[in-house]
Amino acid sequence: MQLSLAPRVRVERPRFAWIAIALQVVTGVLAVPVGIMFIADPSGALMGLPPGWIEATPFGSYLVPGVYLAGVNGIGMLAVAVLGVRRHWSAPWLTGALGVGLITWILVQILIMPETMILTWVFLATGFALGFVALFWLRRTGQLRLW
């Protein structure tokens, strides 16, 4: 068995898919260093966050959020952006999955953290944008037939 990022069948990449690719690159580039900082210092002090914010949550520290942030919202977004550029058949599906993941991540953050910042709402909108682009991308390529 051989794994390859090269698609067997290149899917159409409509112009609007570049919106998702750009959002994935920006999100990934911003998420990786923050995730690494949370992993390096799970108290959040390195990021200037009060320890009381996370101690009262089910996580107890920023370690698990840091791993998710660096792995899924960081490396995952960058990897799927590459798949989108390469017109891999899975790119629209994974774009949708990461959009839903980002929405979930932000909603959990809104529910458990005592304060939000403008980036919270920007990334919530980014998650919805990824989801909608994925939906129309799948529709355009014929991989999803809803209407």
PLM ranges: what are they?
Residues 2-147:
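Topology signature of small-to-medium multi-pass alpha-helical membrane proteins
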